[in-house]
């Protein structure tokens, strides 16, 4: 397991964690170093995780395209990118084209204590396309959890990993609930 300190100190790490749930059903979580620190917890709670330190929105788009070519895109895709580089409207539109009209794109707002902006494109896209995009507002949620972060104010301590996992889990589970008759075990999702 990679700790948040390892993720922060050892950029270059990539974590691909299979989901603990049903194959092909698990939400896919694509992220950068923030998600990298929480990858193990996310995979234990039903997500297929692909996280890489310093991953850019463009690299995330390339990953989605490669998975589409392989026919390996689930119905729900969670994207948590933009800690280092802002996500643009163009990036989001490219993701939507790759995912098509039947999948849901869940966008996580990045939290940067030193830079309180950079979530505008994500928020606008979620408002404009509520049927296809769901906002997961980590930026707002994280403001109340100073103790969740290491000294850089961005990467997660264990308590932050739990809060981050809970937020993503609750958002994805609310989307999955109707498909599995409300049974979290059938959807491969456990409580955080």
Residue locations for each model-derived region?
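Long, well-ordered alpha-helical scaffolding segments within enzyme catalytic domains
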Residues: 94-99, 124
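Catalytic His-Asp segment of secreted/periplasmic serine-dependent ester chemistry enzymes
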Residues: 116-192
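Conserved SGNH/GDSL esterase-like catalytic core that processes O-acyl groups on lipids
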Residues: 21-94, 112-120
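Conserved beta-strand termini and adjacent loop/short-helix elements that scaffold enzyme active sites
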Residues: 30, 50-52, 108, 136-141
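N-terminal secretory targeting modules
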Residues: 1-28, 70-73, 167-169, 173-192
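A short helix->loop->beta-strand "cap" motif at the edges of active sites that frequently abuts
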Residues: 100-105
């Amino acid at each position: 397991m990679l700790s948040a300190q390892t993720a922060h100190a050892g950029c270059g790490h990539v974590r691909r964690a299979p989901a603990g749930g049903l194959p092909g059903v698990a939400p896919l979580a694509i992220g950068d170093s923030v998600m990298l620190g929480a990858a193990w917890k996310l995979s234990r709670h039903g997500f297929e995780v692909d996280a890489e330190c310093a991953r850019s929105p463009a690299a995330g788009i390339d990953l989605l395209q490669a998975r589409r070519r392989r026919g390996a895109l689930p119905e729900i895709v969670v994207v948590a990118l933009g800690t280092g580089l802002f996500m643009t409207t163009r990036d989001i539109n490219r993701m939507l084209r790759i995912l098509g009209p039947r999948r849901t794109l869940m966008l996580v707002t990045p939290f940067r204590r030193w830079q309180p902006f950079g979530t505008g494109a994500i928020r606008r896209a979620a408002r404009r396309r509520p049927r296809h995009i769901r906002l997961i507002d980590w930026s707002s949620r994280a403001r109340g959890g100073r103790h969740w972060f290491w000294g850089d104010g961005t990467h997660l301590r264990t308590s932050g990993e739990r809060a981050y996992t809970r937020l993503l889990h609750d958002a994805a589970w609310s989307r999955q609930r109707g498909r599995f008759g409300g049974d979290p075990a059938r959807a491969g999702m456990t409580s955080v």
